[in-house]
C-alpha cells in the first residue's frame, strides 16, 4: 500500500476518529524537525468518554486489545487535528504501550497489538510498524486500561 493513501485507507476501513482533548497541562504533540512526538493517549470513545478497567480484572485481554486500538484512533485524531493529514506521516518510529493490568497478567504485547495492527492497516506493514515497548503497570490515570505514546517521522 502506498503511504500517500493513509487518509483514504482510514476512510476505506470505515473508522471514526474520536474527539480528543488533553486532560491536564501538557502538549498532546510536539513537532521537532522531521519528527512528531505524541504524548500518552488513552482509549477515547466517540462520546469523549474513556474506556476504563483493568485488564485481567474488569476487562478481558480481547477487550484490552480493543482499547489499545481505540487509543491508536485517538493518536490518529491528534495527528489529523495538529498536522492536517495522516499522509504527512512517513513512518512510525516508536510506540510505548502501557497496560493497566493485574500483576499476574503477562500478555502486554498482545494488548498493544491493537494499536500496532491499526497503524499497519493505515500505513502498511513497513511504514506502519516501528520499534515498540509493551509494559504492565499497576494503575493508569482514570483507571484506563491502556495509554500509548508514539513517535513518527514526517515527510519534509
Predicted regions and their residues:
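Short, polar/acidic, helix-capping and beta-turn segments at strand->helix junctions
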Residues: 1-156
Amino acid at each position: 500500500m502506498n503511504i500517500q493513501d493513509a487518509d483514504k485507507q482510514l476512510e476505506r476501513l470505515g473508522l471514526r476518529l474520536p474527539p480528543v482533548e488533553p486532560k491536564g497541562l501538557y502538549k498532546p504533540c510536539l513537532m521537532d524537525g522531521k519528527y512528531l512526538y505524541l504524548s500518552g493517549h488513552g482509549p477515547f470513545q466517540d462520546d469523549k468518554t474513556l474506556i476504563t478497567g483493568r485488564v485481567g480484572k474488569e476487562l478481558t485481554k480481547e477487550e484490552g486489545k480493543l482499547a489499545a486500538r481505540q487509543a491508536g484512533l485517538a493518536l490518529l485524531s491528534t495527528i489529523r487535528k495538529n498536522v492536517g493529514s495522516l499522509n504527512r506521516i512517513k513512518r512510525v518510529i516508536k510506540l510505548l504501550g502501557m497496560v493497566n493490568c493485574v500483576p499476574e497478567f503477562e500478555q502486554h504485547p498482545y494488548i498493544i497489538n491493537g494499536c500496532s495492527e491499526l497503524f499497519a492497516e493505515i500505513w502498511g506493514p513497513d511504514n506502519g510498524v516501528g520499534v515498540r515497548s509493551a509494559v504492565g503497570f499497576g494503575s493508569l490515570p482514570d483507571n484506563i486500561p491502556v495509554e500509548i505514546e508514539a513517535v513518527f517521522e514526517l515527510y519534509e
